[in-house]
Amino acid sequence: MRSSRQRGDRSAATGGGCGARRWALPRCGALCLLLALGCLRTATDGAKAKCEESQFQCSNGRCIPLLWKCDGDEDCSDGSDESACVKKTCAESDFVCNSGQCVPNRWQCDGDPDCEDGSDESAELCHMRTCRVNEISCGPQSTQCIPVSWKCDGEKDCDSGEDEENCGNVTCSAAEFTCSSGQCISKSFVCNGQDDCSDGSDELECAPPTCGVHEFQCKSSTCIPISWVCDDDADCSDHSDESLEQCGRQPAPPVKCSTSEVQCGSGECIHKKWRCDGDPDCKDGSDEINCPSRTCRPDQFRCEDGNCIHGSRQCNGVRDCLDGTDEANCNNVIQCSGPGKFKCRSGECIDINKVCNHHGDCKDWSDEPLKECNINECLVNNGGCSHICRDLVIGYECDCPAGFELVDRRTCGDIDECQNPGICSQICINLKGGYKCECSRGYQMDLATGVCKAVGKEPCLIFTNRRDIRKIGLERKEYIQLVEQLRNTVALDADIAEQKLYWADFSQKAIFSASIDTRDKVGTHTRILDNIHSPAGIAVDWIYKNIYWTDSSAKTISVASLNGKKRKVLFLSELREPASIAVDPLSGFMYWSDWGEPAKIEKAGMNGFDRQQLVTTEIQWPNGIALDLVKSRLYWLDSKLHMLSSVDLNGQDRRLVLKSHMFLPHPLALTIFEDRVFWIDGENEAVYGANKFTGAELVTLVNNLNDAQDIIVYHELVQPSGRNWCEENMVNGGCSYLCLPAPQINEHSPKYTCTCPAGYFLQEDGLRCGGFNISSVVSEVAARGAAGAWAVLPILLLVTAALAGYFMWRNWQHKNMKSMNFDNPVYLKTTEEDLTIDIGRHSGSVGHTYPAISVVSTDDDML
């Protein structure tokens, strides 16, 4: 409920220059009496001529928005806004309330009264309700139905909790170990030196570890394949497999850092400006060793990150500290609000009982206006207020009922509650004086919490753990190992409809795939892509069946078919440290983070066009990004600022979800599902979860991880189905190489475009690839590195030989052809131009390059 205090100008409230004041009749005879009566008449007559064109004037003089007339709700206290209205007829898809109000049919018996008289939730109507297939009743005394999958899932969804009764104990499978807490974990986690049960019960009564014949035992007791020893890639957490003692040589030197970076003692590179900034960024904290003292002067403010700023910058409304601590807990406004306080015009704050007491308590005597004390302005035209007029000792204030707010100090307008983030779990419908929450297809509202929960199989988290890939259920918390004996998994995604996992291995410089069945059995690993310098992030296009990845060493973003047979570098410029990547094939856009200098989050079409920057300010180390397709938002983690933030998919409406040095010391990857956000933190070696709107309800799901890097939610609703336009009318859209979704910028945008491999260009039909451009091949080779160069070298040799043969043949032909020489310079010029054009049409080594991608299919073509 909001109000507006009116003071001083009474003519605005009452419609006349005399106002509604109490007049003392002076000794001036009949003339003064006539003037007083004239003013009183003006005040009374003016009450009927106050409404604007966009308002409706009630019979009692009140003004209400014109849209409220004949809407079935009496807004004028005399009912005049609902008189002489044509009777409204409800649609067939509506439920007719007893009062005649219309509400959507789907709202009846949903546990939330939508009719003003509550008739859509009446016991007579709802007690006959029959639960649908795959639903169960919450009991004979309840009209509530919930999905079968919510039964015994650890959360009380029925009002009285009947769905969590008589559940019995969870029985672990033969391949699992039962923790003391009742949690089920993989037997391979038992006695592995890590507390996977979270209560330590999986590490009790463990015999000294022994490794197999073909294994090497690290000093930390971990076993690794013997072939991994002394291969210049540390697989033991203590690096004992690459030690001088084991290998007889010094470990391979760490990668060289650029001039704008410094090298950590643990080998990685960080920005030079992060050295000695008070915040450890290296894994071993070496960037904060041997740093000068960071003591601020007495006239300075010390930021939480250790930086010093001038004291005058604290609480000046500008974030001068990188972490914003100079603007925290600021309160520059003198509080003088509430019904018991009065703000003097001279600035003082006094008690309301001192107003109009014939004593000047304000310096300027503004608490004792002789002509305004004890005048009830609400008696005339309700003070000009559309709803509530509240008389005050001096002046009056307009107020609104719940669900409304003042739009012009007098008129109440509907509050659009849907503008508040998180007010609804998914869909928010703004109503007059309120709002209604609904869920997207595939979700159902939990009436106990208001959260839209997924219907169907239990959602789970799948995450990398360097040498294996693990899964934990979000309801029953079953914790198992999916893929084992990996080298160094750094990125992960899935094609959920096809039940396939995809991961990138940093050590093997490759991307792999494997099928996963309903029993969590993983099939044979298939290497689909090779020659990737430093894979940082991968994203699967589940509709068009392609895979996108970032390469932090080659500074590229590429795409390939899921079988790896066709690949293409989409971006190889203006990338510094490309990291996480996400795709939305429904709209044809992809998103990625880049923590280079300057750090940013970018967006582009999945075909490599329409590149744009989304986030460029207050961002330093954006590691993980994730899309919330239900709410159309992008979330990201900043490992330097220790923040979890979000923006809409156009880079607007930025919100800070969580800032925490405790839970976000070095976050790496995140994923979104329902109302929750889940992330991996590398420093804490844990998986956390929190509310995606508020950052509250923090929980720890997994502890004691080993260099975990990426995480996804595995559930069919994460990847909504859509049309593959590349297979709509022609195989592969008629493209001779890759068919890629185009960004849906407007209704005229193409649905897809074709693209060609390095060295080739699209012909005029926009479908076939032709020609050969050696410069683009060189760029592709540079992007792939030495291994890629060897793969492309035979092609270059063949092309070179073909070109040499062609020029030898053409030279022989010229020598054996009779020629005529004309001295006419005009003719000579013309024939030379014609010759150049002819060669350009038939030669494969032309200098002209056609556009890489051409429009193929649009909505208009489908009509």
From Swiss-Prot:
Signal peptide limits: 1-43
LDL-receptor class B repeats: 457-498, 499-544, 545-587, 588-631, 632-674, 675-717
Ranges in the topological domain labelled Extracellular: 44-785
Key words, A-Z: Cholesterol metabolism, Coated pit, Disulfide bond, EGF-like domain, Endocytosis, Glycoprotein, Lipid metabolism, Lipid transport, Membrane, Receptor, Repeat, Signal, Steroid metabolism, Sterol metabolism, Transmembrane, Transmembrane helix, Transport, VLDL
Cysteines engaged in disulfide bonds, as pairs: C51-C63, C58-C76, C70-C85, C90-C102, C97-C115, C109-C126, C131-C145, C138-C158, C152-C167, C172-C184, C179-C197, C191-C206, C211-C223, C218-C236, C230-C247, C257-C269, C264-C282, C276-C291, C296-C308, C303-C321, C315-C330, C336-C349, C344-C362, C356-C373, C378-C389, C385-C398, C400-C412, C418-C428, C424-C437, C439-C452, C726-C739, C735-C754, C756-C769
Tissue expression: Abundant in oocytes; much less in heart and skeletal muscle.
Every LDL-receptor class A domain range: 49-87, 88-128, 129-169, 170-208, 209-249, 255-293, 294-332, 334-373
UniProt keyword annotation of Cell wall biogenesis/degradation present: no
Gene Ontology MF terms in the entry: apolipoprotein binding; calcium ion binding; lipoprotein particle receptor activity
Biological function: Multifunctional cell surface receptor that binds VLDL and transports it into cells by endocytosis and therefore plays an important role in energy metabolism. Also binds to a wide range of other molecules including Reelin/RELN or apolipoprotein E/APOE-containing ligands as well as clusterin/CLU. In the off-state of the pathway, forms homooligomers or heterooligomers with LRP8. Upon binding to ligands, homooligomers are rearranged to higher order receptor clusters that transmit the extracellular RELN signal to intracellular signaling processes by binding to DAB1.
Name under which the protein is recorded: Very low-density lipoprotein receptor
Protein's organism: Gallus gallus (Chicken)
Encoding gene, per UniProt annotation: VLDLR
